[in-house]
UniProtKB/Swiss-Prot annotation:
This is 1-(5-phosphoribosyl)-5-[(5-phosphoribosylamino)methylideneamino] imidazole-4-carboxamide isomerase. Belongs to the HisA/HisF family. CDD domains: HisA. It comes from Sulfurisphaera tokodaii (strain DSM 16993 / JCM 10545 / NBRC 100140 / 7) (Sulfolobus tokodaii). It is an enzyme of class 5 (isomerase). It holds the Pfam family His_biosynth. GO terms for biological process: L-histidine biosynthetic process; L-tryptophan biosynthetic process. It catalyses: 1-(5-phospho-beta-D-ribosyl)-5-[(5-phospho-beta-D-ribosylamino)methylideneamino]imidazole-4-carboxamide = 5-[(5-phospho-1-deoxy-D-ribulos-1-ylimino)methylamino]-1-(5-phospho-beta-D-ribosyl)imidazole-4-carboxamide. Pathway: Amino-acid biosynthesis; L-histidine biosynthesis; L-histidine from 5-phospho-alpha-D-ribose 1-diphosphate: step 4/9. NCBIfam families: PRK13586.1. The active site is at D9, D129. It comes from the Archaea. The lineage of its organism: Archaea, Thermoproteota, Thermoprotei, Sulfolobales, Sulfolobaceae. GO terms for molecular function: 1-(5-phosphoribosyl)-5-[(5-phosphoribosylamino)methylideneamino]imidazole-4-carboxamide isomerase activity. The gene is hisA. Keywords: Amino-acid biosynthesis, Cytoplasm, Histidine biosynthesis, Isomerase.
Length: 230
């Protein structure tokens, strides 16, 4: 079974949906807490939240994250700019279910290991933001780092979120190569980037993905209302 997880990206106090991560592109949706509550009222019990400003080291939106975590979702995973133990613990104190980390293991392995040691691997999801060349992208998807497979072999966590950045926010379809990555790992397997149709969801389920994170296809209505595929 594949579970569908709506996403909320927050920038400057507003829920947004960017295209390929480019600031100013895509949709401005409004108050993120209101959007989250609407999602909850529609019967979704899992949510993916990203603080874009914190990720870009240009402020933070923690007050909205805190309020979203109080709504009543069974599971809220939060990412964006988590670079130290203090922030990781603070987010967990807000009752978020897990934190999402991407750049830190590559740029500052010691800080990552400190976080892992204190809060535990079972509270950390690693986001593998990658391109068609098979490299992990960091620093706002502007810098290539290491090969995806090298990354997967280097770290352990609750699970991995595979984000295919070239199709993020486009609804152009998934990256079928993700099936070659998920077979290498244990734990939760999540995917984001380009999901635009029910066929994409069926493929991801076939590949062994547990959660499909949807943004543009949710807010544009093409996949809104779908919660599972089998």
């Amino acid at each position: 079974m594949l579970k569908v997880v709506p996403s909320i990206d927050i920038s400057e106090g507003k829920a947004v949906k960017r295209i390929r991560g480019v600031k100013g592109s895509g949709l401005i949706l409004g108050n993120p807490v209101k959007i989250a509550y609407e999602i909850y009222e529609e019967g979704y019990d899992y949510l993916h939240v990203v603080d874009l400003d914190s990720a870009e080291e240009n402020g933070n939106n923690e007050e909205y994250v805190k309020d979203i975590c109080k709504i009543g979702f069974k599971w809220v995973q939060v990412g964006g700019g988590i670079r130290n133990v203090e922030k990781a613990e603070r987010l967990l104190d807000y009752d978020c279910s897990a934190i999402v980390i991407s750049t830190l293991p590559i740029k500052d392995p010691k800080s990552f290991m400190d976080i892992q040691k204190i809060i535990g691997k079972d509270k950390i999801l690693l986001s593998v933001d990658y391109d068609s060349s098979g490299y992990v992208l960091i620093r706002g998807w502007k810098e290539k780092s290491i090969k995806v497979l090298d990354f997967l072999l280097s770290y352990d966590s609750l699970g991995y979120i595979f984000t295919y950045v070239e199709n993020e926010g486009t609804k152009r379809g998934i990256d079928n190569n993700v099936k070659n990555y998920v077979i290498r790992i244990k734990g939760l397997k999540e995917y984001a980037g380009g999901i635009g149709s029910i066929e994409d969801l069926y493929k991801l389920n076939e590949y062994g993905i547990n959660y499909a994170i949807i943004g543009m296809s949710f807010y544009s209505g093409s996949l809104r209302g779908i919660k599972y595929v089998y």
